[in-house]
Amino acid sequence: MTETTPEGIVNPPIDQLLEHVDSKYRLVLFAAKRARQINAYYSQLAEGLLENVGPLVETTNQEKPLSIAMREIQAGVVEAHEMDAEEIAAQAAAAQEAPAIELDDPFADLADPNA
């Protein structure tokens, strides 16, 4: 018996996916990055961290993150945004100004009991 709807990498069709990005290479990078975010979401779900956004389309049991990512791209719920050199420089400067980790000792203000 044959399936009427194609499954696997051909669903959604590559032509429909390429309407949302300008090249196959960018499509692969975009879908892979989004699939990693979805995978991280599922990994963090049990821990209650929820640092990543979960699937934005309906999913089925045992559906792979890459398939979910491609369906999100086809539906237009995620968009690829290319950063120019100015945006990258501004983001790097902001990251250097505000460190993510404080290196100060929280117990430095406490009196030394041996003194």
Swiss-Prot record:
GO CC, any one term: DNA-directed RNA polymerase complex
Family indicated by similarity: Belongs to the RNA polymerase subunit omega family.
Subunit structure: The RNAP catalytic core consists of 2 alpha, 1 beta, 1 beta' and 1 omega subunit. When a sigma factor is associated with the core the holoenzyme is formed, which can initiate transcription.
SUPFAM superfamilies: RPB6/omega subunit-like
Catalytic class of the enzyme: transferase
Gene: rpoZ
Species of provenance: Cutibacterium acnes (strain DSM 16379 / KPA171202)
EC number(s) on file: 2.7.7.6
Function: Promotes RNA polymerase assembly. Latches the N- and C-terminal regions of the beta' subunit thereby facilitating its interaction with the beta and alpha subunits.
One Gene Ontology MF term: DNA-directed RNA polymerase activity
Gene3D superfamilies: 3.90.940.10
Official protein name in the record: DNA-directed RNA polymerase subunit omega
Keyword annotations of the record: DNA-directed RNA polymerase, Nucleotidyltransferase, Transcription, Transferase
One BP annotation, GO: DNA-templated transcription
